[in-house]
Amino acid sequence: MFPRFRELYYITHIDNVPSILEKGILSHAEIERQSINCKKVYDNSIVLKRKSRLLADNRSLWEFANLYFQPRNPMLYRLLVQGLKPKDLAIVAVKWTIMKRDDILITDGNAASSETQIYRKSEIKNIKNIISVKDMEYWREEDGSKRKIMAECLVPQCVDPRYISAIYVSDHEVASNLKKAINNRNIPVIPDPTFFFLPNREIKLTQNLSLVEGDMFFSRMQTLTVSVNTVGVMGKGLASRVKYQFPDVYVVFQDACKKKELEFGKPYLYKRESSLDAFLAEDGEKLSDLNHQTWFLLFPTKRHWKNMSEIKGIESGLRWIVENYKKEGIKSLAVPALGCGLGGLEWSIVGPLMCRYLTKLEIPVQIYLPLEKRIPDVQLSPKFLLDS
């Protein structure tokens, strides 16, 4: 018996949605057999990998419609960094009852990967482990989570339109246009930017400075700022995420603390030579025109991890950024609400201070809002943040 969950997901070009609602989600082989004209989203390397993997009965993955348990995955990220815009894509939600079909197959990762096992329903001993990827928010190559988060339900030939429960798109304007394109059929079209690695909201304060509510580690900024202490411990908050997802950053952080290169009021810039896009996208190392480097700015907001954050040290660090960003080659910058949340400082104090300094930068800057509690709208206004 399969545990219940809400939906599975199919990633497609938004122009294909009307046809999908009429004919269903077809396997690529079935699309070719029926000579259906559709907009393809996958490049040749992805196509060849899926065509070439054969099952024991000699069927190719090309004969199956593939549904993901978690659509916010490396494959979707790849499509977006290859040049497709969020508005070009739709995520088709499929009722979990498709799993009751006896002819489906389940994979424990990206089906095209040689490391992935493909199971019949009767062969699976613990489906919960596979389905748990629906709760994953990020991934790494080293521990296999990058492959596992792309676990699939493979449906032979076609997913009947009756199984389709909703369509997710990137914003309200796209949703409105799609509703018209499908003649306002009785199916929900839901704008959800987080599915497409977009922030929940963005508030533009100046030409270069914005407030963002979302996951900073999916920012396309060249330099990501991480709040740290000066004793080399990454235990909670964003720092603990960095320690797990980017262990090389943690090693550099500890070394900088030991050598006193990172001090209170003086951030340390780690000019990492690898691309976050390559790290996050499926087969990202083979893609061209990526963000070539993702740097990390280690910004001390407290002296010891046991202490609360100190506003004076934060101001000194902001001053360092203003004085050094050009010389260091920082081209764009993402910064969390320094010292807020676990640091114990209030946005009403930190926000205006950060904006006072960061408005001086002649580069794109995103301030990521604290998620621990909702900030009153009045404290997010240009008047409050820029005129204080």
Curated annotation (Swiss-Prot):
| Active site feature | R50 (proton acceptor), E152
Residue ranges annotated for the DarT domain, each copy included: 6-197
Q: Where is this region: NAD(+)-binding element?
A: 34-52
Record EC number: 2.4.2.-, 3.2.2.-
| Biological process, per Gene Ontology | peptidyl-glutamate ADP-deribosylation
A Pfam family for this UniProt protein? Macro
Q: Which GO terms describe its molecular function?
A: DNA binding; glycosyltransferase activity; hydrolase activity; nucleotidyltransferase activity
Cite the entry's keywords alphabetically: DNA-binding, Glycosyltransferase, Hydrolase, Nucleotidyltransferase, Toxin-antitoxin system, Transferase
Q: What positions does the domain Macro occupy?
A: 196-376
Which PROSITE patterns does the protein's record reference?
Answer: DART, MACRO
Q: Which InterPro entries match?
A: ADP-ribose_metab_enzymes, DarT, Macro_dom, Macro_dom-like
Residues that, per the record, bind ADP-D-ribose: D215, M216, S227, V228, N229, T301, G339, C340, G341, L342, G343, L371, E372
Residues annotated as binding NAD(+) are Y10, I11, T12, R50
Catalytic activity of the protein = an N-(ADP-alpha-D-ribosyl)-thymidine in DNA + H2O = a thymidine in DNA + ADP-D-ribose; a thymidine in DNA + NAD(+) = an N-(ADP-alpha-D-ribosyl)-thymidine in DNA + nicotinamide + H(+)
Fill in the domain comment. The NAD(+)-binding element stabilizes the ADP-ribosylating turn-turn (ARTT) loop which confers substrate specificity; both domains contribute to ssDNA-binding.
* Function of the molecule: A fusion protein of the toxic and antitoxin components of a hybrid type II/IV toxin-antitoxin (TA) system. The N-terminal domain ADP-ribosylates ssDNA on a thymidine residue, while the C-terminal domain removes the modification, neutralizing the toxic effect.
**UniProt name for this protein:** DNA ADP-ribosyl transferase-DNA ADP-ribosyl glycohydrolase fusion protein
